[in-house]
Amino acid sequence: MAACGAEERQRTGRLSALSVYRRAAGPGRLERRRRGTPLPAGGKRTKARLRRGAAGGGGPERAAPPQGAAVSDRVERAGSSEAKQGDLKTNPSGPPAKAPAGNLETKSPGGPLTTSVGPRAKAPAGSPEAKPPGDPATSPGGGGVPGLLRRLGRLEDSRRRAAELFRWLVAPAAPEEFARQHWERAPLLVQRGDPGYYAGLFSTADFDAILRSGDVHFGTHLDVTSYAEGVRETHNPVGRALPAVVWDFYQNGCSLRLLSPQAFSTTVWHFLSILQEHFGSMAGANTYLTPPGTQGFAPHYDDIEAFVLQLEGKKHWRVYGPRTSSEALPQFSSANLTQAELGEPLLEVVLEAGDLLYFPRGFIHQADCLPDAHSLHITVSSYQRNSWGDFLEKLLPAALQMALEEDLEYRQGLPMDCLGYMGVANSDAVDARRTAFVEKVQHLIKKLVDYAPIDAAMDQRAKSFLHDCLPPVLTQSEKQLSVYGFPARWQDGGPRNVDIQITKDTEVRLLHHGVVRLCNEEAGVMLYYTTENSRVYHKEEPKYLEIDPEYTDSIEFLLSSYPNHVSVDTLPCDALEDKISLATLLFEKGILTTKKPLVQV
């Protein structure tokens, strides 16, 4: 508040910090609208600078946490737009013009790389097409997304739950078609004409409730952003994000990005915890709330596969293909780009509530709000650093280490005179010694494949994935049949129902298919698991049990038997005592469930 003089500070000394901000910055956007006076250009940025105590711009973009943003500056960014009948065109100098109500306008060059899927045609009542078998989106029960998740919970196999949830996500496009034509290749646009499709997943009411009841802090959980006149700024103050401050930022034209909503919303947590099993890679999310007629982010591309779910209002999107082959499927997100660096959009569309837009990593995108509606969307992201190259980064050093230990040829010395004929300065020289040297390197590289511990490297990648994972959300039945529903309690002055009575006849199975991973490590055999993970990304260290090698066959037996139950007596351990001990240990960690509730003695 350096802008306030001593007299002003004395006059406002008893006012709240928010009142001081308002006095320093002048009336807010809403008050100006009531007075009928225009909002001065750049007003919201001046106010935001006062809040964060900085005189200049927003500074470098803060890296968002991997779980929430496997989406760093993801999913918005725009120049202004002007919507006309039959097309959406860009007007870089003025605010967005109003689009015709209810009109979903798409601009696309066509061709095989961009597909727009309209709403599912209504099938005749009673026909097989009316309710495809196994399609939870069309099964009876309603209840929006929470109802969908409950119905998925009736499926015994967690892999089927994940597959059916993904089918619902991209419907009416078929998952097989999506994998063949779009995944890592091209955007997919689904215009459903169904504003209630995502009902119950997340809403502005949820956003407000989180601000009021959650421990939300600027920068850690919430970003306040703007993008105007080619300038992208972050306006985060220090400290807790209180509703009065946050909503005043919004009133003054700033976008709000809630990082990792799964840490606050049980429904989003449940949604992502199922979906991550489909991808076999961490599934993260951010939510974006944007005021009418504004945008919060500059054009850019990301290092994740992005699924944009339009929850409320509408938003104008432009998506551009990678500019060069090196930008296709990038390892890292780009810096903010300028409008001058962009070509013609591959896809231009207004998303309305219930619509879906998918685009692969490396596809540049930007989005702005039309003046007649706010926008709330959630971006679900996955496949960050999950490429062949990322796998080889871990595999090849291990292969080389094994080759050095086991093969004399890798330990033999280099030729004494190789410095004289190798190197860039000698690259054009015609020399038989150079030819022999290159051939030797090629031979050793090819031979390295024989030492590559491919399965062990994949186990380590799976271990990393399990650390990234959200903990599973249990159905009511799973709770009753697991340690989480075990009736141990304090009663009549002492603990009751404490003993876990697992016998040789108890039938058990893994909680979910991907809940554990066996890894052979130098320290021993480790069983990594997800049931004790945090909803906050990497808040806890990886969870594992050190397993006696004689138990590995039993773990593999449980993995291969899923989703079927097996009796404890069938576990391939030498002694019955070992079978019961292992089953009890896994039950206590929430890894195993029983077919029937355990009987209390």
UniProtKB/Swiss-Prot annotation:
Region named Disordered: 1-149
Name of protein: Ribosomal oxygenase 1
Record text on cofactor binding: Binds 1 Fe(2+) ion per subunit.
Record function comment: Oxygenase that can act as both a histone lysine demethylase and a ribosomal histidine hydroxylase. Specifically demethylates 'Lys-4' (H3K4me) and 'Lys-36' (H3K36me) of histone H3, thereby playing a central role in histone code. Preferentially demethylates trimethylated H3 'Lys-4' (H3K4me3) and monomethylated H3 'Lys-4' (H3K4me1) residues, while it has weaker activity for dimethylated H3 'Lys-36' (H3K36me2). Also catalyzes demethylation of non-histone proteins. Also catalyzes the hydroxylation of 60S ribosomal protein L8 on 'His-216', thereby playing a role in ribosome biogenesis.
Basic and acidic residues bias (residue ranges): 1-11, 73-87
GO MF: 2-oxoglutarate-dependent dioxygenase activity; histone H3K36 demethylase activity; histone H3K36me/H3K36me2 demethylase activity; histone H3K4 demethylase activity; histone H3K4me/H3K4me2/H3K4me3 demethylase activity; iron ion binding; peptidyl-histidine dioxygenase activity; protein demethylase activity
Annotated binding of Fe cation, by residue: H300, D302, H365
Enzyme class of the recorded protein, top EC level: oxidoreductase
Family per similarity comment: Belongs to the ROX family. NO66 subfamily.
GO cellular component: nucleolus; nucleoplasm; nucleus
Organism this protein belongs to: Gallus gallus
